[in-house]
């Protein structure tokens, strides 16, 4: 959903009463004439005609300005009010100043009843919005009280709650998925009615060491601390570069008017449940914020660049006599400038987005939020009652019709074609008709939107650069970023995640044009604990930290073309895990020999499987100490059956009689081990071969003849006792020099070795990371693939984390086994 149409700002269409003038203009011009004309007549004899004329103009000019002047949609008197309020009525500098609740009782002659009565009077005046002008930083914060459950009381009897929500993948989604998300977000906005104002807050703040990802690689008493130091340095460097330390968070604050907290709380809880239900339908994780979390959020908004952690407990209020605002207020606020303000040591500027475009893209908000700058983007949204909205639009259409008639009359009087109308009038007429149709038949609602951007920077030059950059993005989409002159205080307090709006600039929008400001970009993967580093998010430029063992399934695959860095990424994960989680073990199945140098550097065991290699793995090895309910001999018999089937070959594989004979021989070969005799030795393939020759069935001789090549023949690589250290923490099995005749069998035996090692580690309480490089080779042969899929499914249940790597993602996609992996 790249673009949606935006309705024209119909507030520019004024209702004309008489003489083609609005009611405001008639009153102002009439008042000017009622005062100015008598003044002219009375002073004409004394001052002369010219002097009296200038006097009359001087008297009438303020009324003319009052009638005609507008700035940012505000009439003349409100512009003047903002200037007077900022320059004279309110102090420009607000210092941090506490109002300890115990202080009044310490004064001489202070009576308890008098103090309580004064406190009630002050709270009552503030609740009605009639409190005195803010004299301190604490008094600038507009809320009245914050409750532990997250309910906040604001002036005017408004109670609000806040929900924090996370991102989902929108930017990289398909067109169909983007359309579905847009439709769901539109329905979400339509949930709010005219009695439920809400605020969307998008906060970019620069994080510091305490809030950044922690590099959890502790030192150990081994030979790898130098590697740990180097790897830790790399991680810290990447974390420092991740979006230059910008953390992005998203919140929605909603409020309801109520007589008191008892009435507001249950209603807010119902709304909160509905909001979180709507987020869940969008697959957006969300979390309600309690009172302390909301205070921590306000603290972060009012302490830009601060490294101080938020320290607060509800017990601190009665113990210290301080209010909650004393824990979150900044050191100072300075609103003396018309276009900027100071908060602590930081500079700030509040601007609003003037939407002039006829259509908007879903990239506008995303591009603003992707900037490397500290900022708060706020969208205060007030739903207009549907009947009232339709009535208003019909009134605008009627006004446009009157303007058309007036223009046509002028055309007739002037002698030109009355069908020629001003282009703006035609555009407004068309847009108003379309807007009415949208409201009546297309499930659209009307919203009043206040879109503000608060930029913060450590110095004024950086601030102006950031504002200029945001303005450039707005201009790119045919919008304008305009500074709130003499309204910096109102803009700043409106940006706080309280649901309180003092900015009077509103833009009429429909559901679709409001929903196009989609707050989703890309899902971040940030997990705590023993999380490993997996690179940088290409869209958000944040680090990816994940603990695969905490996911629903730890299975994973590295996919990519040749040279794309699959092996490098797997080695980085392997090294990170080796240094971070010392109790876990690693097995690498390496067909190309790429991992051997790293494994040797980590003190692991490299097993080279090749005809001329001194390393041997005995496929007959069996571990009898397995968990209850498991039969190791039955599992070994199943493996040897599949091995013999691979050796015998043919389209039909082993026949039932052959399987029976093999199973009988396996039980005979392992008889001494099963009985637990001290003289029992681990058998070899040779033992199975000889046992088959002793059987009377001719099917046994057929299988034995097939095994002869691998027992007494030239390919007897696996007819030796295991002579390598298989209990090392890191084991790498290299299959690089295997010929085609041995490769299938080697792969099969390797799978069995991995399965047994994982079983043993699981029995000892250790997790195993099994890396299968070029794993598509394991899926070429149906029999090998079948056994590998069975092993793959078993690994997850045994506490294994199996990463697989391949560049051939289309290897037999029609095969069910490939799909199973």
Model-flagged regions — what are they?
Residues 1-9:
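Short, charged cytosolic
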Residues 13-39, 147, 152, 168, ...:
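Glycine-rich phosphate-binding loop of nucleotide-binding enzymes
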Residues 35, 39, 43, 62-63:
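Alpha-helical membrane-inserting segments
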Residues 45-60:
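Hydrophobic alpha-helical transmembrane segments
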Residues 56-60, 72-77, 88-94, 104-107, ...:
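Extended, folded cores of ATP/NTP-driven motor/assembly subunits in large transport
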Residues 64-82:
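Membrane-helix interfacial anchor on the cytosolic side
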Residues 168-169, 175-195, 205-208, 226-228, ...:
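P-loop NTPase motor domains
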């Amino acid at each position: 959903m790249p673009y949606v149409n935006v309705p024209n700002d119909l507030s520019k269409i004024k209702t004309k009463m008489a003489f083609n003038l609005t009611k405001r203009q008639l009153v102002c011009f009439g008042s000017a004439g009622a005062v100015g004309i008598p003044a002219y007549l009375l002073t004409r004899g004394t001052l002369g005609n010219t002097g009296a004329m200038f006097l009359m103009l001087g008297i009438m000019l303020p009324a003319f300005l009052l009638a005609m002047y507008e700035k940012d949609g505000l009439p003349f008197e409100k512009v003047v009010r903002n200037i007077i309020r900022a320059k004279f009525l309110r102090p420009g500098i607000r210092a941090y100043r506490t109002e300890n609740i115990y202080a009044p009782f310490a004064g001489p002659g202070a009576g308890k009843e008098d103090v309580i009565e004064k406190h009630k009077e002050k709270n009552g005046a503030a609740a009605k919005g009639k409190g005195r002008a803010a004299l301190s930083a604490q008094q600038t914060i507009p809320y009245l009280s914050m409750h532990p459950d997250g309910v906040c009381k604001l002036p005017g009897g408004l109670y609000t709650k806040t929900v924090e929500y996370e991102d989902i993948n929108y930017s990289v989604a398909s067109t169909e998925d983007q359309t579905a998300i847009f439709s769901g977000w539109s329905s979400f906005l339509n949930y709010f009615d005219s009695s439920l104002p809400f605020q969307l807050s998008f906060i970019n703040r620069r994080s510091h060491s305490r809030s950044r990802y922690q590099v959890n690689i502790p030192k150990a008493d081994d030979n790898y601390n130098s590697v740990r130091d180097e790897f830790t340095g790399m991680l810290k460097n990447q974390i420092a570069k991740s979006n230059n330390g910008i953390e992005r968070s998203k919140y929605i604050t909603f409020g309801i008017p109520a007589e008191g907290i008892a009435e507001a709380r249950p209603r807010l809880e119902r709304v909160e449940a509905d909001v979180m239900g709507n987020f869940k339908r969008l697959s957006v994780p969300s979390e309600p914020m309690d009172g302390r979390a909301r205070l921590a959020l306000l603290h972060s908004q009012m302490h830009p660049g601060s490294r101080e952690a938020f320290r607060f407990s509800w017990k601190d209020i009665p113990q210290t006599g301080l209010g909650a605002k004393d824990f979150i207020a900044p050191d100072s606020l300075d609103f003396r400038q018309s276009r900027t303000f100071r908060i602590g040591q930081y500079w700030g500027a509040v601007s609003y987005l003037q939407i002039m475009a006829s259509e908007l893209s879903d990239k506008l908000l995303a591009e603003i939020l992707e900037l490397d700058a500290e900022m708060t983007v706020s969208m205060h949204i007030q739903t207009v009652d549907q009947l009232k909205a339709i009535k208003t639009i019909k009134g605008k259409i009627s006004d446009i019709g009157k303007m058309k008639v007036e223009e046509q009359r002028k055309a007739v009087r002037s002698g030109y074609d009355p069908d020629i109308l001003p282009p703006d009038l035609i555009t407004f007429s068309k847009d108003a008709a379309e807007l009415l149709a949208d409201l009546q038949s297309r499930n659209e609602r009307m919203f009043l939107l206040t879109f503000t951007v608060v930029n913060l920077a450590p110095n004024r030059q950086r601030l102006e650069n950031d504002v200029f950059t945001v303005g450039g993005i707005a201009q790119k989409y045919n919008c304008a970023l305009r500074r709130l002159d003499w309204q910096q205080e109102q803009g700043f307090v409106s940006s706080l995640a309280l649901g309180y709006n003092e900015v009077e600039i509103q833009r009429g929008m429909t559901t679709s044009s409001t929903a196009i400001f989609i707050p989703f970009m890309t899902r971040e993967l940030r997990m705590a604990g023993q999380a490993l580093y997996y690179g940088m998010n290409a869209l958000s430029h944040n680090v990816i930290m994940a603990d695969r063992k905490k996911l629903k399934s730890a299975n994973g695959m590295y996919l990519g073309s040749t040279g794309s860095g699959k092996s490098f990424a797997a080695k980085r994960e392997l090294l990170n895990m080796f240094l971070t989680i010392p109790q876990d073990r690693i097995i690498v199945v390496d067909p190309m020999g790429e991992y051997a140098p790293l494994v040797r550097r980590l003190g692991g065991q490299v097993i080279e499987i090749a005809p001329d290699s001194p390393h041997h793995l005995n496929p007959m090895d069996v571990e009898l100490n397995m968990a209850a309910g498991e039969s190791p001999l039955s599992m070994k018999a199943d493996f040897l059956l599949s091995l013999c089937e691979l050796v015998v070959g043919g389209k039909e594989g082993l026949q039932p009689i052959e399987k029976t004979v093999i199973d009988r021989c396996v039980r005979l070969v392992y008889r001494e081990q099963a009985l637990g005799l001290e003289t029992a030795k681990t058998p070899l393939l040779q033992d199975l071969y000889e046992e088959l020759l002793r059987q009377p069935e001719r099917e046994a001789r057929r299988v034995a003849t097939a095994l002869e090549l691998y027992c007494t023949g030239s390919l007897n690589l696996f007819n030796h006792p295991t002579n390598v250290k298989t209990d090392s923490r890191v084991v790498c099995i290299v299959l690089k020099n295997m010929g085609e005749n041995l490769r299938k069998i080697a792969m099969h035996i390797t799978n069995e070795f991995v399965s047994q090692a994982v079983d043993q580690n699981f029995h000892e309480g250790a997790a195993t990371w099994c890396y299968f490089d070029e794993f598509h080779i394991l899926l070429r042969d149906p029999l090998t693939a079948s056994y590998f899929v069975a092993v793959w499914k078993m690994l997850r249940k045994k506490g294994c984390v199996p990463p697989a790597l391949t560049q051939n993602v289309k290897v037999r996609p029609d095969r069910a086994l490939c799909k199973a992996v």
